[in-house]
Amino acid sequence: MLVLLGKTASGKDSLKKELIKLGYQSVVTTTTRPMRDGEINGVSYHFIDDDTFLEMEVTGQLAESTYYETAFGRWYYGSQLKDLKELSNEKKVVILNPDGIYSLMTKIDMSDWMICYIDCSEETIRKRLEQRGDDSEEAERRLEADRKDFVNIKRVCDHVFTNENNTDIESLARIIDFMYGRNSK
């Protein structure tokens, strides 16, 4: 399993799309947040309501979960156990946050997983959030949350990549694919 980890607007989703073009299967995570323009239920995320999410949590259907207090209310995120298990042992990619990584480390053998942190400056993140039209209050909340959530996260990552310009995401995907191939042999 290849895990992409990074702050908001670091380029994780763009990188995941490039890795899928290289033959990776996507592990679709679950959220209660509203869909953004261009997102597709079951492809971008499994979009569900709060009650369904909380029921899945109580019944042990989630391998990991977390929530964020946003300007629009509480949004839950998590990975369903079935989604982590049902794909073949071939190349799989999932985007997780620090809570997800730490939670999975206590539940699943991750010894053959490769965790890649996608790093970029806060200035770059601000520009990207503005370009995609995110609400300024919500953007500030996410930046503040990331400052706390990502403290010391690099220590659990196998590789750290910088994505400041977002112009050569294809090359970055090929590099990660090469490294993953070497890591999984």
Where are these regions (language model features)?
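Walker A/P-loop
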Residues: 12-13
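P-loop (Walker A) phosphate-binding loop of NTP-binding proteins
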Residues: 7
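Hydrophobic anchor at the beta1->P-loop junction of P-loop NTPases
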Residues: 4
